[in-house]
Regions:
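A metal-dependent hydrolase metal-coordination microenvironment
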Residues: 1-108, 112, 119-127
């Protein structure tokens, strides 16, 4: 029988535009009863360097490696890749190839803000 384990799949730390330090975020997510989180800072994976097995074990909180690709064409959550997949030059014409590369790296991807219609700062999803 499958067991439901709630996860926070889209969160940021001070490594991009969040307010929490990595340990604070993990502690907060665990305090709310989540089993884990995907650390998805904007165009940064440096926060993952602060995630330790001890921190996860102490809080009973699994941390999935992720990143939020933040481009002029939209924001894409990329979770679970075993290597870096370059987002810097992805365009609507090359998104299919980028998605194939994410999959080849063992990752999954999803639109970060599917209902955002766009603004000068948040371009929505124009993939």
């Amino acid at each position: 029988m499958l067991k439901y384990r709630p996860f926070e799949m889209h969160c940021h730390t001070r490594h991009s535009d969040g307010t929490f330090l990595v340990p604070q975020l993990i502690e907060s997510v665990a305090a709310y009863g989540y089993a884990g989180l995907a650390l998805t800072d904007h165009n940064a994976v440096t926060g993952l360097l602060e995630v330790t097995e001890e921190l996860q074990r102490k809080n009973n909180c699994l941390v999935l490696p992720g990143i939020e690709w933040t481009t002029f064409y939209g924001h894409l959550l990329v979770i679970g890749c075993d290597r870096f997949v370059d987002w810097r030059f992805v365009t609507p014409d090359t998104i299919d190839e980028a998605l194939q590369e994410i999959r080849a790296a063992g990752g999954i991807a999803g639109v970060a803000h599917p209902c955002e219609v766009g603004s000068p700062l948040m371009c929505g999803c124009n993939w």
